[in-house]
């Protein structure tokens, strides 16, 4: 007597392979950095062929960005809270950003990714579109609400959002000093003084 077996679901198998590739990429990015990361090493770690990787991603940069975004859960609806207290809301958001930058898993891989964008304009544009622009847009939406409530002046919201995040990223990227709660509070206070 033979038993009818269902053939494996290719979509499920592909999803398993895809997840293995993303995990291997994130792991290797943290271990060897962007420059030394190869598609061959990713394929070997994930237990797939290079052709499987290239079926889903056109190049290393696209794969690394997808792996990074999957790791940090960055591609979700982003909102900045609106409690009515702009200063508290901005402290919360900037504090969350600082916590992410201080997370060793995040920091190591983000620094590696930023190394990659130096020589890969396509990767730089994708990072901007998929990670930075959505976050800046959410911040600008909160600032726009503050403008409408009369809490801040009519200013260029692109500049205002970058004024908020710029000092933190500068200090983190160049390691010019610690990013403490006091530092975050000072950045928010100075930003609001400039905007009110």
Stretch-by-stretch model annotation:
Residues 14, 125-136:
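Amphipathic, non-transmembrane alpha-helical scaffold segments
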Residues 1-45, 51, 56, 62:
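Basic, helix-initiating cap at the start of DNA-binding domains
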Residues 77-110:
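Hydrophobic alpha-helical connector segments
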Residues 62-71:
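Alpha-helical DNA-contacting segments of helix-turn-helix folds
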Residues 67-68, 101-126:
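Amphipathic alpha-helical segments used for helix-helix packing
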């Amino acid at each position: 007597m033979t038993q009818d077996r269902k053939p494996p679901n290719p979509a499920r198998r592909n999803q398993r392979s895809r997840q293995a590739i993303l995990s291997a990429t994130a792991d290797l990015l943290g271990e060897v950095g962007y420059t030394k990361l190869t598609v061959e090493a990713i394929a070997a770690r994930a237990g797939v062929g290079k052709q499987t990787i290239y079926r889903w991603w056109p190049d290393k940069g696209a794969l690394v960005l997808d792996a990074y975004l999957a790791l940090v859960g960055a591609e979700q609806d982003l909102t900045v809270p609106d409690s009515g207290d702009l200063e508290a809301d901005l402290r919360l958001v900037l504090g969350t950003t600082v916590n992410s930058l201080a997370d060793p898993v995040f920091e190591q891989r983000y620094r590696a990714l930023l190394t990659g964008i130096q020589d890969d304009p396509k990767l730089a544009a994708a990072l901007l579109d998929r990670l930075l622009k959505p976050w800046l847009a959410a911040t600008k939406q909160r600032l726009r609400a503050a403008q409408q409530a009369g809490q801040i002046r009519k200013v260029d919201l692109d500049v205002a959002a970058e004024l908020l995040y710029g000092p933190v990223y500068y200090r983190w990227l160049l390691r010019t000093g610690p990013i403490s709660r006091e530092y975050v509070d000072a950045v928010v206070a100075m930003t609001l003084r400039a905007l009110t």
